[in-house]
UniProtKB/Swiss-Prot annotation:
Pfam families: COX6B (PF02297)
Record-stated family: Belongs to the cytochrome c oxidase subunit 6B family.
InterPro entries per record: COX6B-like, CX6/COA6-like_sf, Cyt_c_oxidase_su6B
Protein name as it appears in the record: Cytochrome c oxidase subunit 12, mitochondrial
Localization (cell): Mitochondrion inner membrane
Organism per entry: Saccharomyces cerevisiae (strain ATCC 204508 / S288c) (Baker's yeast)
Motif window: Cx9C motif: 27-37
CHCH domain location: 24-67
GO cellular component, one term: respiratory chain complex IV
Keywords from the UniProt entry: Disulfide bond, Membrane, Mitochondrion, Mitochondrion inner membrane, Oxidoreductase, Phosphoprotein
Length: 83
């Protein structure tokens, strides 16, 4: 999403699934959850935006760009299809 560069920074709230200081897994899971949510409910579904804000706050831009490219090519490792 192009809004990333214009949106204000914010701190992501606590998530009990990721109590460790290292938030790499939280970043990955939020990216996957966002795309799963969008595939099931559509981009305008407000709860999906929580995952979008989380992964944009936690994940390095290089990772996001790489994952976006992988999704476009159909080689993304995560399961983002609706179950």
């Amino acid at each position: 999403m192009a809004d990333q560069e214009n949106s204000p920074l914010h701190t992501v709230g606590f998530d009990a699934r990721f109590p460790q200081q290292n938030q790499t897994k939280h970043c990955w899971q939020s990216y996957v959850d966002y795309h799963k949510c969008v595939n099931m409910k559509g981009e305008d579904f407000a709860p999906c935006k929580v995952f979008w804000k989380t992964y944009n706050a936690l994940c390095p831009l290089d990772w996001i760009e790489k994952w976006d490219d992988q999704r476009e090519k159909g080689i993304f490792a995560g399961d983002i299809n609706s179950d």
